[in-house]
Regions:
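Bacterial Sec-dependent N-terminal signal peptides
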Residues: 9, 13-47
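Active-site-adjacent "subsite" loops/lids of carbohydrate-active enzymes
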Residues: 44-64, 145-224, 276-280
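Catalytic domains of carbohydrate-active enzymes, especially glycoside hydrolases
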Residues: 68-95, 224-228, 351-364, 426-434
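Aromatic-lined carbohydrate-binding/catalytic grooves of carbohydrate-active enzymes
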Residues: 82-124
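Aromatic- and acidic-residue-enriched segments that line the glycan-binding/catalytic groove
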Residues: 97-110, 151-194, 233-272, 324-335
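Substrate-binding cleft/loops of secretory-pathway carbohydrate-active enzymes
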Residues: 152-155, 239, 305-372, 376-377, ...
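Active-site neighborhood of glycoside hydrolase catalytic domains
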Residues: 216, 220-224, 228-232, 237-238, ...
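Substrate-binding cleft of secreted/luminal carbohydrate-active enzymes
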Residues: 347-463
Length: 463
């Protein structure tokens, strides 16, 4: 869930880059009205799960070579009242922290440290994921493994360099996304200016070779039999509607609509713009179907190897604009084409590509500003959760959670009073519990007591 960095100062950038979140381009914020803290949901007898995310990059310096540090922090996680951990084992470079027959092991990642912006290296040979599974289970924690899905490399800012499969294997360039730039279609691997093009290099979700590769990787991951497997960045890339306009995508789209596109790509969107053409809504449906169909394949791949492992995704809760990522995470019973302004981008069959009914659980990023906890609209933590639940329509248990290190007002710490409120807003609005992103922020800003207070306040309502 790693964001683009908001470079305001060296200090803010250090905090931000050390532990980021998936937040592709977002719209103007709609704050809505504040509500009373307690919410209106009635207490439930059964405890809901409490997850804490463990981002690979944000925690790499502390965990990559130290089992003792992992043990120490997991004890704190348990004592604080969390029930589950979500361990990121495939960051945006695409390399992995588990044994795989198809992916390279993660050996280094870019971080901000006391020494500045540097590469952090892993020299240890012990199994990273297995260690979390062993140590977490000893404490009674459930251990979920998370991967960044359609990613294959990372170009660092400041000239630090790059890493990942797309950079090591030139033959994989055809797997990278192609954007609908002004005047021509451009493979993102041809965009290598570290001042303007830095960030994640995505893979094309419509490329069948890419999908087969990722399914093999998921099969390897499922052999660990974690309590859950979660797909992050299972979407199109940060260029939004400009992606993907490769020959492979054109071929698949024409099969989808049953005819040739006479003027590609302008009949979909005018190059370099988001001005819609005649096929615009069908293109949005095609992209959503591409992700929907991959979710089904991924679910089946995991279950074939480890039937008891729960399968889910992380998505941004901003449904009103998440279509630009090619994802419909809602229930297929929810029809956006009949829901006000959504009809401008959603065709009548867009609902058919909602994938919530193919999941065991889902995580909604409720990434609002620090002073926008309670409310009923998007861009409030509580509103994100309530609106998300309405679109999921009971198809899947869902957990919402804030980003307590990167969102507006959270960046510099000192927000311990807002952490319990965030926990309250999420856990009472979500039937599947809550999560916090990320453990590195809890540790960095010493939010342990604040987390425990929020969880204890909730537990008092169910006992």
């Amino acid at each position: 869930m790693k964001k683009k960095l908001w470079i305001a100062s060296f200090f803010c950038l250090c905090l931000f880059a050390s532990c980021g979140g998936d937040d592709n381009k977002v719209p103007d914020w709609n704050w809505g009205e504040e509500e009373e803290e307690g919410g209106t949901d009635k207490p439930e007898a059964k405890e809901k799960p409490r997850y804490v995310w463990i981002d690979a990059a944000g925690n790499f310096e502390r965990y990559a070579n130290s089992i003792d540090n992992i043990k120490e922090d997991l004890r704190k996680v348990k004592e604080t009242g969390f029930t589950d951990i979500v361990v990121d084992v495939r960051p945006t470079t695409g390399d992995v922290l588990f044994k795989s027959s198809v992916a390279e092991p993660l050996k280094r990642i870019d971080i901000w440290s006391n020494a500045g912006y540097v590469w952090a290296e892993r020299t240890a040979t012990w199994d990273y994921l297995q260690t979390f599974l062993d140590e977490g289970h000893k404490l009674g924690l459930k251990v979920n493994a998370c991967i960044n899905t359609f990613v294959g490399g990372y170009l660092c800012p400041y000239g630090l360099g790059y890493e990942g499969m797309l950079y090591r294997d030139a033959s994989k360039k055809k797997w990278a996304t192609v954007i609908n730039a002004t005047g021509r279609q451009v493979n993102t691997m041809d965009l290598q200016n570290y001042e303007t093009d830095w960030g994640v290099k995505f893979l094309n979700p419509a490329n069948n070779e890419v999908q087969e590769y990722l399914l093999s990787l998921l099969s390897d991951l499922a052999k660990y039999k974690p309590d859950g497997i979660i797909l992050d960045r299972c979407r199109y890339d940060d260029y939004g509607l400009m992606s993907d306009f490769s020959p492979e995508s054109r071929t698949e789209f024409e099969l989808f609509i049953g005819e040739s596109v006479e003027n590609f790509p302008a009949d979909i969107m005018k190059p370099g713009t988001d001005i819609p053409g005649k096929w615009y809504k069908r293109w949005n449906a095609f992209r959503a179907k591409t992700i929907h169909d991959f979710i089904i394949k991924a679910h089946d791949e995991v279950k074939a190897v480890s039937p008891d492992t729960r399968f889910g995704t992380y998505v941004g809760a901003w449904y009103s604009t998440y279509y630009t990522s090619g994802v419909n995470w809602a229930s297929p019973k929810y029809n956006p084409a009949a829901d006000g302004s959504y009809s401008r981008w959603a065709d009548s069959d867009y609902k058919d590509y909602g994938y919530a009914d193919h999941l065991d659980f889902i995580f909604l990023g409720a990434y609002a500003a620090v002073d926008k906890i309670y409310g009923s609209t998007e861009w409030t933590v509580q509103g994100f959760c309530k609106l998300g639940g309405a679109k999921l329509m009971g198809d899947v248990p869902f957990a919402g959670g804030p980003d307590i290190g990167n969102g507006s007002g959270w960046e510099n710490g000192g927000q311990a009073n807002q952490v319990p409120k965030s926990i309250n807003a999420c856990i009472n609005a979500c039937d599947g519990g809550m999560f916090l992103f990320d453990l590195c922020h809890i540790r960095m800003h010493n939010y342990w007591d604040a987390c425990k207070q929020g969880i204890d306040n909730y537990l008092k309502t169910v006992k």
